[in-house]
Amino acid sequence: MDISSGLETHCPRERRSVPRARRFADETLTGWGLAGWGRTGDVLLCVSELVTNAVVHGVPPGRQLLVFLRWDGRLLRVEIHDSGGGEPRATDGDTCAEGGRGLLLVTLLSDKWGVRQRELGKAVWCDFAL
């Protein structure tokens, strides 16, 4: 598959979008023959964390987010597009806080992650080498 192609789904700004996006990613990986891949759990957790961040911090009310997966046989990229402003930053994660560890987990589980500004909002992405 060409890295420029991929599969996507739109999700509303709702907490129930997190399991929906995770299922989409799981079904996509299965369709690409990656169901038994040793990093599938890492990918699914990163999808959950990035979608949660988009729902809580990135998507203005009444808008949707986009989950986009690309795979070229060597590299899997997860992208979460939202129309919110700002740039997310990984923190050390306060051990007493209820949240704040999502990007720390993405940092630890993926090979690389970053933010790409778009005309309207941003795309937060993470890569996994196969």
Task: Please report, for each region that a protein language model flagged, where it lies by residue.
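Short, structured helix-loop boundary elements
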Residues: 15-18, 40, 44, 103
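Conserved short strand/loop->alpha-helix "switch" segment adjacent to the catalytic nucleotide/phosphoryl-transfer site
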Residues: 26-48
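Conserved beta-strand-loop-beta-strand hairpin that lines the nucleotide-binding pocket
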Residues: 1-10, 55-130
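Preference for short coil/turn "hinge" residues that link or interrupt alpha-helices
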Residues: 11, 27, 52-53
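Alpha-helical protein-protein interaction elements
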Residues: 16, 37, 49, 105, ...
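Histidine-centered phosphotransfer motif of kinases
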Residues: 42-60
